């Protein structure tokens, strides 16, 4: 209930500010379909579905004690949707996500590093971590290495974004790949249609894909 109430405050603040805007706009990498503005379109990844796929991948590899590092669900819409995806995957596999497996972090190396250390200090059994961004995944991996542990031998990691960083880190990071070029192209096309053709707002979800590389280990129970 607390989270839902804070979401309403966040959305109400955005609505109050955007209600003063009277020109066509496109919200990029975030959803605007529930905001109800005729002049506000959106193009984004389905963050909830993508996070659910990432978590399902870990469950399919035998992991059950999966931690989450990410932004504050009460302050960020993408973070809230990715948190929901995590919870949905847990429920699908007959489990309930426990809050002590969640560590909040900003989308930075340093913040995720500290968040991973916080999880390790809680001394809870963790075999895998889903990080809401590739930058977070790298920060978490550095904390794991500094604690004398290994990825994926001791703890598996899945990231989100599909940046080049995930391909050039060692080990390469399993990640959700967002199609940024398509998101950008569609955003511009929709904006021009709204301006030149006076078209009403549309809300599109661009397909995503899970990129399977090196940072996840299948447990023996699989």
Segments from the language model and where they lie:
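Bacterial carbohydrate/catabolite-sensing allosteric modules
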Residues: 9, 15, 19-222
């Amino acid at each position: 209930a607390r989270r839902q109430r804070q979401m309403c405050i966040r959305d109400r603040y955005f609505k109050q500010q955007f209600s003063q805007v009277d020109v066509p706009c496109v919200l990029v990498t975030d959803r605007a379909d529930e905001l109800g503005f005729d002049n506000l379109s959106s193009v984004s990844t389905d963050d909830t579905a993508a996070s659910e796929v990432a978590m399902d991948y870990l469950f399919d590899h035998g992991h059950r004690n999966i931690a989450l590092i990410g932004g504050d669900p009460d302050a960020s819409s993408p973070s809230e949707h990715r948190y929901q995806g995590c919870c949905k995957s847990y429920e699908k596999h007959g489990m309930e996500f426990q809050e002590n497996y969640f560590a909040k972090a900003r989308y930075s190396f340093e913040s995720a590093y500290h968040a991973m250390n916080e999880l390790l200090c809680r001394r809870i059994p963790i075999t895998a971590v889903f990080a809401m961004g590739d930058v977070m995944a790298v920060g978490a991996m550095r904390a794991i290495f500094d604690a004398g542990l290994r990825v994926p031998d001791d703890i598996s990691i899945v990231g989100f974004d599909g940046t080049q960083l995930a391909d050039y880190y060692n080990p390469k990071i399993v990640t959700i790949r967002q199609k940024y070029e398509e998101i950008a192209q569609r955003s511009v096309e929709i904006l021009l249609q709204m301006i030149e053709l006076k078209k009403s707002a549309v809300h599109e979800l661009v397909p995503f894909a899970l990129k399977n590389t090196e940072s996840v280990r299948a447990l023996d129970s699989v």
